[in-house]
Amino acid sequence: MFKKEKIKIERKKLLELGRKIETLDLSNSNKYFLNLISLNSELFILIKDLINKEEKTSFISENYNIELKMLYNEYAIKDEQGTIIDFNPNDQTYLAAIQDLNFFYKDEYKSMLDRKEMFNSWLLEEIEIEIVKLDFNYFPNIYISPIIYKYLAFNI
């Protein structure tokens, strides 16, 4: 009914799989895929951890972009209702504020890029994991949508 198998796979492929699984409609027709997820709980914990690590590597740039938008909004020329009607990117106080922001984030940004580079090379490493697969000889009449079948064919 189920087969256990050890496979070698790049962490990056697991991360891609995790991203695709997040977008799948795991409705009732795909309950066998849900069973596969529960049988492979350790694998999916690993995938979730990879997704969290990836999100943490881009956190600093998001903060920088938010602060940049706040500066733009602060120095923009607005009408009485507060609607931005003009903006002078050469305004000296705005340029000084941008310089301060860039100086503050310079080291943060460099360390973020270093972490991202290390993370990307770490993702390319192969790891060995044990997975549980459905043996389709036992389930000849199961309907599995093409998208689910594609991921099952991916060895999961």
At which residue positions do the language-model features occur?
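A composition-driven surface/loop motif
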Residues: F2-I156
